[in-house]
């Protein structure tokens, strides 16, 4: 049983080493038709996170 766990550990270490040394794609292919209206960054849209409104809701629930 000890030998099996050592072999599994060695395989995991080797695969992790190979994964860490893998080179990322230099120029990944762009999306075929990206949506210009899609906003991937929620912080870029000021209406996406209404922190003041959230604080008011939490305060009203606590009182």
From Swiss-Prot:
Propeptide residues according to the Swiss-Prot or TrEMBL record: 23-48
Reported tissue expression: Expressed by the venom gland.
Key words, A-Z: Amidation, Antibiotic, Antimicrobial, Cytolysis, Fungicide, Immunity, Innate immunity, Membrane, Repeat, Secreted, Signal, Target cell membrane, Target membrane, Toxin, Transmembrane
Major place of residence: secreted
AXPX repeat placement: 22-25, 26-29, 32-35, 40-43, 44-47
Any GO BP annotation: defense response to bacterium
Disulphide bridges, residue numbers: none
Coiled-coil regions listed: none
GO CC annotation terms, alphabetical: extracellular region; membrane; other organism cell membrane
Compartment(s) where it occurs, according to its Swiss-Prot or TrEMBL record: Secreted; Target cell membrane
Segment forming the signal sequence: 1-22
GO molecular function, one term: toxin activity
Function in brief: Antimicrobial peptide with activities against the fungi B.cinerea (MIC=5 uM) and C.albicans (MIC=100 uM), the Gram-negative bacterium E.coli (MIC=25 uM) and the Gram-positive bacterium S.aureus (MIC=100 uM). Shows cytolytic activity against insect cell lines. Has no hemolytic activity against human erythrocytes. In vivo, peptide injection in the vicinity of the head and thorax of lepidopteran larvae induces feeding disorder followed by death due to starvation.
Family the entry assigns: Belongs to the MCD family. Eumenitin subfamily.
Identification of the protein by name: Eumenitin VP1
